[in-house]
From Swiss-Prot:
Stated role: One of the primary rRNA binding proteins. Required for association of the 30S and 50S subunits to form the 70S ribosome, for tRNA binding and peptide bond formation. It has been suggested to have peptidyltransferase activity; this is somewhat controversial. Makes several contacts with the 16S rRNA in the 70S ribosome.
Chain's gene name: rplB
Protein known as: Large ribosomal subunit protein uL2
Taxonomic source organism: Natranaerobius thermophilus (strain ATCC BAA-1301 / DSM 18059 / JW/NM-WN-LF)
Oligomeric and partner information: Part of the 50S ribosomal subunit. Forms a bridge to the 30S subunit in the 70S ribosome.
Record Pfam families: Ribosomal_L2 (PF00181), Ribosomal_L2_C (PF03947)
GO cellular component: large ribosomal subunit
Length: 276
């Protein structure tokens, strides 16, 4: 994938870059794999803001992705590579020999016509999904499960991957994109290869309007607010925070303070923390 630049015919296009989308082979999605998606604008069921800075995005439909990859022993053929507005990665449409169609995350290097399989007997090839016990140590994987049969949860964004670094007993040591090393059960599944669209991190939106199309609203600094709205607010002129450290709008420390619970159940599965 390459990045496309524009001539500076306007201030918004001066630094704007987009993905060339050379890999995409189909414009219209598969209708049987679409679902309605309502824009909640960051509101909960009471209509109150639960997630700030969201709203006003372009209408879109959800693409139903096969996270579990549980169709064992049935080969499939990659029909097309498609754009998905709901995620940074591209998606691949699979046509199984029994007639079923499913979407998966498009791994790096996959193309229409490639053969894809799932199950313990599948080959170690990009796009194939296997239990971790059947994947050699050192292999790069993505869409990794945390619990068997729950569906992939780790390394699903564009360009991300995990690496199996060791196997011990019932667990494998997996290095995550955050550099954290975590123990994951050998029966959990993972897909071989790296997620495609690796140049996504280098894309420059170029103007505020493109962010608004994505549903991102402006972020207002706490020091620019009134004292009633934020712990950093108030004061005469451009006043400083006025406290020893920074705080969230709800009064919790947000700098120099560990916000993870000290006795979390998943701590026993973490071999190396991401900040060590």
């Amino acid at each position: 994938m390459s990045i496309k630049k524009f001539k500076p015919t306007s201030p918004g296009k001066r630094y704007m870059t987009v993905a060339s989308k050379e890999e995409i082979t189909r414009e219209e999605p598969e209708k049987s794999l679409l679902a309605p998606l309502k824009n909640k604008s960051g509101r909960n069921n009471q209509g109150r803001i639960s997630t700030r800075r969201q709203g006003g995005r372009h209408k879109r439909k959800y693409r139903i992705i096969d996270w579990k990859r549980d169709k064992d022993g049935v080969p499939a053929k990659v029909a097309s590579i498609e754009y998905d507005p709901n995620r940074t990665a591209y998606i691949a449409l699979l046509n199984y020999v029994d007639g079923e169609k499913r979407y998966i995350l498009a791994p790096l290097g996959i193309k229409p016509g490639d053969k894809i399989e799932s199950g313990s007997k599948a080959e170690i090839r990009p796009g194939n999904a296997l239990p971790i016990r059947n994947i050699p140590v050192g292999t790069i994987v993505h869409n990794v499960e945390l619990k068997p049969e729950k569906g992939g949860q780790l390394a699903r964004s564009a360009g991300t991957y995990c690496q199996i670094v060791a196997k011990e007993g019932k667990y494998a040591h997996v290095k995550l994109p955050s550099e954290e090393v975590r123990m994951i059960h050998l029966d959990c599944r993972a897909t071989v290869g790296q997620v495609g669209n690796v140049e996504h991190e280098n894309i420059d939106l170029g103007k505020a309007g493109r962010a608004r199309w994505q549903g991102k609203r402006p972020s207002v600094r706490g020091v620019a607010m009134n004292a009633v709205d934020h712990p950093h607010g108030g004061g005469e002129g451009k006043a400083f925070v006025g406290r020893k450290t920074q705080y969230t709008p709800w009064g919790q420390k947000s700098a120099g303070y560990k916000t993870r619970r000290k006795a979390k159940k998943s701590d026993k599965y973490i071999v190396k923390k991401r900040n060590q």
